[in-house]
Curated annotation (Swiss-Prot):
The chain crosses the membrane at residues 6-26, 33-53, 61-81, 87-107. It is found in: Cell inner membrane. Signal peptide: none annotated. This is UPF0060 membrane protein Ping_0587. Coiled coil: none annotated. It comes from the Bacteria. Belongs to the UPF0060 family. It is a multi-pass membrane protein. Keywords: Cell inner membrane, Cell membrane, Membrane, Transmembrane, Transmembrane helix. One of its GO terms (cellular component) is plasma membrane. It holds the Pfam family UPF0060. InterPro entries: UPF0060.
Length: 110
């Protein structure tokens, strides 16, 4: 159950970060309304708050979170930007998830 909870928190955190960064991108690069910065700020504030809910030390959390972030970013690529990930993208995600699992669930007495 702990693994599922950690994965869930990491996933929600990644979505908050991606939304918070994607909305300014839409404003700066694609000419959308500057008002997108308002929900972007809320999303990034939620991202920071969500990081405080993670069960491990900050450095370990950030390192492990990166694996989930990569996964969610590629899902975003596919679902929001309509660009299908390549096989090497998917292999990279698998490697990142394995790395995240080693960091989060590996023994601490070494």
């Amino acid at each position: 159950m702990e693994a599922l909870k950690i994965f869930g928190i990491f996933t929600v955190t990644a979505v908050a970060e991606i939304v918070g960064c994607y909305l300014p991108y839409l404003w700066l690069r694609q000419g959308h309304s500057i008002w997108l910065l308002v929900p972007a700020a809320f999303s990034l504030a939620a991202f920071v708050w969500l990081l405080t809910l993670h069960p491990e030390a900050a450095g370990r959390t950030y390192a492990a979170y990166g694996g989930i972030y990569v996964s969610v970013a590629l899902m975003w690529l596919w679902l929001v930007e309509s660009t299908r990930p390549t096989m090497t993208d998917l292999l990279g995600v698998l490697i990142c998830i394995i790395g995240m699992a080693v960091i989060m669930f590996g023994p601490r007495n070494v």
